[in-house]
Amino acid sequence: MTKLEQDLVAMLTPAVEMLGFELHGLEFVQAGRHSTLRVYITHEAGISVDNCADASRQISAILDVEDPITNEYDLEVSSPGVDRLLFKQDHYEQAQGEEVQLRTKLPQDGRRNFKGDLIAVTSDMITLSSDGTEHLIMLSNIERANIIAKF
């Protein structure tokens, strides 16, 4: 997570929680001159479109006042979905036994992309079983990870 993303999480979490939701995570994606801030919210009863609209208004008001992003950007607020991104250690713990795909920041075992079953989680590492091989991957080396939805 970048410094900007960390600052945004700290800034937005209280407002999201005040609405009764949990800030699952966020990502700031830049593609040339176009940027998108994606904020994922959760609730044990699920998230509706109205919930996303309420959270979007609250988040937008905070961002307008604090102005942490200097360039133009689009704000998207949604539930994490069935193929949810994994941001925090407890997300990985909840996903144990699930199939996940991930990309590491630095190459590991000669590659950066992995897909397999998440079989163990510790405070700083996960174990991923892929094609009969177990890979120990530091949480700090994971750039992006998500659950693979099964239908």
Curated annotation (Swiss-Prot):
CDD domains referenced in this protein's UniProt entry, alphabetically: YlxS_C
Cellular component GO terms held in the UniProt record: cytosol
Keywords: Cytoplasm, Ribosome biogenesis
Location relative to the cell: Cytoplasm
InterPro entries referenced in this protein's UniProt entry, alphabetically: Ribosome_maturation_RimP, RimP_C, RimP_C_sf, RimP_N, RimP_N_sf
Source domain of life: Bacteria
Family matches, as Gene3D superfamilies: Ribosome maturation factor RimP, C-terminal domain, RimP-like superfamily, N-terminal
UniProt main location, coarse: cytoplasm
GO-annotated biological processes: ribosomal small subunit assembly; translation
UniProt signal peptide: none
Family under the similarity heading: Belongs to the RimP family.
Job of this protein: Required for maturation of 30S ribosomal subunits.
NCBIfam families: PRK00092.1-1
Protein name per the record: Ribosome maturation factor RimP
UniProt organism field: Pseudoalteromonas translucida (strain TAC 125)
